Amino acid sequence: MAKFHFEKGHMVPVPSHSIIPERDLGSAPVLECSHLGIQFGGLKAVDDFNLTIGRTEIAGLIGPNGAGKTTVFNLLTKVYQPTMGTILLNGQDTSGKTTAQINRMGIARTFQNIRLFNNLSVEDNVKIGLHNHNRYSMASGVLRLPGYWKQEKAAHERAMELLSIFHMEDLANHKAGSLPYGAQRRLEIVRALATDPSLLLLDEPAAGMNPSETAELMENIVKIRDTFQIAVMLIEHDMNLVMGICEGICVLNFGRVIAKGTSKEIQENPAVIEAYLGRSRTKED
């Protein structure tokens, strides 16, 4: 059966040689957090966090500054080891895993502050994300044996295909640091996708973007989900973005979940209005 992906508002066929992976689209969730928490001294930064994310769901994590949102991402990626609770990724317990192991298991992440290698080319930044797929030996790399060149050719093709999905292939030889802000954000997402995740974590992806760039970002997030058939979880303060594309939203306040539901349910929840949305409306008024 032919595969398709989202392109400028339309579904178009995916080439037979595409790097877009075949995925098991069973009903099992991609992520299950049960009673997750972490304590720093006497401070419970995250407490009794429970969340399930479907295999191709776009989920939002919102809350006031200091609510614990980025700490949740740090727990999921094992920047911090939880002091309580469990995390299942694709049904596998992640207890005791390192950040690198979590990445190989299927979680990729972007950060609030862009973390590109500014002096490297756009293509080389994407190739860094492909390092998990390199299979040549150290000797092959040092001596430039045929196995090395075969892997390099494959990496180039994969990087260019990923860039083409976001119309960035013409920028492949540009220095990453020379790109406009919005393009740097896209490149960071492309590099994360190069690791072949089943769950993509986006930490404030619209930060610093103008309305036009934010609208393009919204389309790109939907494109990512539809093209790669993965789940996306994002932290974001732009409520138009969150309410516009997130199918499920979780609200944190002081490290605890105060509400979960659809965008309509969240907007009508009194606790959310008081803790988060109400503050935004007060500022707008």
Task: List the model feature ranges, each with a label.
Residues 2-285:
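Glycine-rich phosphate-binding loops of nucleotide-dependent enzymes
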